[in-house]
Each structure stands twice: as C-alpha cells, then as structure tokens.
Amino acid sequence: MDTKTPVTLAKVIKVLGRTGSRGGVTQVRVEFLEDTTRTIVRNVKGPVREGDILVLMESEREARRLR
C-alpha cells in the first residue's frame, strides 16, 4: 500500500445483512475512530463481524440500504 494514500479507520458497530447476487457482500454500519459521532453504512466483501476495524480508502461514499 502506498504510504501517501490517506486512509480512515472505522469500527463495525452493527452487521445489517448480506447483499450481492450470491450473498458475498455484507452491509455494515461503521463508526469512525477519529470522529465517534459519525456513522455510515458500507458494503464489505469477505468475512466481517461486530468489533472489526476496517481500513477505508474512501470515507465519504455511503452504501444504499438493503430492501
């Protein structure tokens, strides 16, 4: 990973559900470690559970909610 790329650390506070054509993506609500008042919904590929720390390359984009 390039050291010049700014990253944001976020903690998974709730697993919302599975999405994707085969369920290979998990929708989670994350809380930023620098600003704990800010939470967003993101899609995560691979295994994830509550309490995990994610490294977000881009922290402004939010996932659409599951139906």
UniProtKB/Swiss-Prot annotation:
PROSITE patterns: RIBOSOMAL_S28E. Disulfide bonds: none annotated. GO terms for cellular component: cytosolic small ribosomal subunit. InterPro entries: NA-bd_OB-fold, Ribosomal_eS28, Ribosomal_eS28_CS. It comes from the Eukaryota. Pfam families: Ribosomal_S28e. Belongs to the eukaryotic ribosomal protein eS28 family. This is Small ribosomal subunit protein eS28. It comes from Kluyveromyces lactis (strain ATCC 8585 / CBS 2359 / DSM 70799 / NBRC 1267 / NRRL Y-1140 / WM37) (Yeast). The lineage of its organism: Eukaryota, Fungi, Dikarya, Ascomycota, Saccharomycotina.
